[in-house]
Design a protein with these regions (language model features):
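Eukaryotic basic, amphipathic alpha-helical target segments in cytosolic regions
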Residues: 123, 139, 143-147, 167, ...
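Short, flexible helix/strand-to-coil boundary loops that buttress conserved ligand/catalytic motifs
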Residues: 139, 247, 311, 336, ...
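C-terminal capping region of solenoid repeat domains
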Residues: 2-46, 50, 72, 178-180, ...
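Short catalytic-loop micro-motif centered on adjacent basic/acidic residues
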Residues: 147, 232-234, 256-257, 310-312, ...
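N-terminal adaptor-interaction module of cullin-RING ubiquitin ligase components
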Residues: 1-285, 298-301, 319-323, 347-348
Length: 522
């Protein structure tokens, strides 16, 4: 028997068993080996052809065929296997080598978007868009909010391809036609507008300062097609036709800020049945003026029954319009009046807002000059917060009626209101459930007037007094001092001296001048 032979290990078997019989009879094993070789192999580029200057390498004679043992049989591979693995180099258990050095290109768009979305810094995200055109397009897909300044960027369609996934669009600045050569001077209109540069001959009551209504309506139709998932929109000078087309294409719109609003436009607003937050600006003194009356408020209330927050700025109306809002919008929780032009008697309609939790009056020259009898006012039983900011509070009966309607509030904020004296502020005693009181910028209220109010608030837990110059530290009585001691939270900075002394504690800045002038004394 030859040394390369395979002896039969089974004595009961008559014929000897060799390796060739094992491979030929077991086809599954052969296929498994072939597939394993394919999986572990990798392709390499063929070597470059030799240059014509260099002589070809000498060919070595093929090695003589080796004499195989008589009982060992060579199994030829299939033609398909030979054709597939022609010019391959097989290295067992070697990692796959990528011929290109750009491993990021192997990532899918979804994976890279998830990585880029985890970056906390917005400036870092913007710089990433400069890496390549691919990253530039991906960065545009991550943007959710846009404020349009260049109207041509919108009308040309570039915004739709650059930012395909927007849910928040602000068209206010782009809707105003401003002068490009008057950059140094501007007209500031508050937080909503910011600075605008408008020529004196262009700025006129004929609305030549704004984009035409038909242009805005055509843009709204494009937005309805491009962004069906739009959730927030700020626009100016549109019509009910454009709003109705937007309502059909964007059924999930939840928040809208509508400038230059009037009764006719509110027919289109009523088409947004899922609207939850709405801000209507009817008139801004010196900029534009439009009419929002009880008719428009009634149309709005009947169409947008899911409103949670409503702000009326520069809007007219009366008892009927506010009552319609309270009866139809049962989910309304926050109501804001900014610079209102309401007729007398509207205050008693607030009692129809049964689920109202926050009432804000901002920049109001008056509240309600003729509120009516106390028994007709009613009350907002679930109201928790009352905020008065930059209002004129010099009418005692008007403020008293407001406190009667809001007598169940737990938080009261009075900021930068003029005309408020001790006698008028005394009506705050009607709100006996107040736990948090914040008074700021009320220069005519004295320490005595504050004491007469806070001592009647038996549930008071927190007090903030800021920039009220008629309140003095040395005027605090022992009773008021004991009340301060029992509060959970107290912030007492009635004048600028108190603010400055509090901010300079431990710095020593307030004493250096005194040492200097002592040296100059003779």
């Amino acid at each position: 028997m030859s040394s390369c032979s395979v002896e039969n290990q089974n004595p009961n078997h008559s014929s000897p068993l060799n390796w060739s019989n094992l491979w030929l009879k077991n086809k599954k094993a052969l296929d498994h080996v072939s597939s394993t070789i394919r999986r572990r192999s990798f392709y390499r580029k063929p070597p470059p052809p030799p240059t014509p200057q260099s002589p070809p390498p000498p060919q070595q004679p093929p090695p003589p065929p080796q004499q195989l043992p008589p009982e060992v049989t060579v199994v030829p591979l299939s033609p398909h296997f030979q054709q597939t693995h022609y010019n391959e180099t097989l290295l067992p258990d070697s990692p796959e080598v990528v011929p290109s050095h750009d491993f990021i290109s192997l990532l899918s768009d979804e994976t890279l978007l998830q990585i880029l979305s985890k970056l906390p810094d917005r400036s870092q995200r913007n710089s990433n868009s400069l890496v390549s055109k691919w990253w530039f397009n991906l960065q545009g897909r991550l943007v959710r909010s846009v404020r349009v300044f260049d109207w041509s960027f919108l009308t040309s369609g570039r915004m739709f391809t650059r930012f395909p996934n927007l849910i928040d669009i602000d068209l206010l600045h782009g809707s105003v036609i401003s002068s490009s050569h008057l950059k140094s001077c501007g007209l500031s209109l508050g937080r909503e507008f910011g600075p605008f540069c408008i020529e004196s001959d262009v700025f006129s009551p004929n609305n030549h300062t704004f984009r035409p209504v038909n242009e805005v309506d055509s843009v709204l139709k494009c937005l309805a097609t491009a962004y069906p998932n739009l959730q927030r929109l700020v626009l100016l000078n549109s019509s009910e036709i454009g709003l109705l087309s937007l309502a059909e294409g964007c059924p999930n719109l939840q928040e809208m800020v509508l400038h230059h609003c009037h009764d006719q436009i509110l027919h289109g607003i009523a088409g947004f049945t899922n609207l939850q937050i709405l801000k209507l600006i009817g008139t801004i003194d010196g900029f534009y003026s439009s009419l929002v009356s009880d008719i428009g408020l009634t149309i709005l209330a009947q169409g947008c029954r899911r409103l949670v927050k409503l702000e009326l700025r520069g809007c007219e109306g009366s008892y009927d319009g506010i009552r319609a809002i309270g009866q139809c919008c049962q989910m309304l929780e926050e109501l804001t009046f900014c610079d209102h032009r309401m007729d007398n008697g509207w205050l008693s309609a607030l009692s129809y807002c049964e689920n109202l939790k926050t009432l804000r009056l901002v920049s109001c020259k008056t509240i309600d000059q003729i509120p009516g009898l106390d028994e007709h006012l009613g009350a907002c039983r679930l109201l928790e917060r009352l905020q008065l900011e930059r209002c004129r509070l010099c009418e005692k009966e008007s403020l008293r009626a407001l406190f009667l309607v809001c007598r169940s509030v737990k938080e009261m904020v009075v900021k930068d209101c003029w005309g408020l004296t001790d006698g008028i502020f005394l009506n705050a005693n009607l709100c006996r459930r107040v736990k948090f009181l914040w008074i700021e910028g009320c220069s005519r209220v004295t320490t005595e007037g504050l004491e007469s109010v806070v001592l009647s608030l038996k549930e008071l837990e927190s007090l903030k007094v800021i920039s009220c110059k008629n309140m003095k530290d040395d005027e605090v009585s022992p009773v008021l001092s004991m009340l301060f001691y029992s509060l959970k939270d107290l912030k007492w900075m009635p004048d600028n001296r108190s603010v400055l002394s509090t901010s300079l504690v431990g710095s020593g800045m307030g004493k250096r001048g005194g040492k200097f002038f002592k040296k100059l004394q003779i």
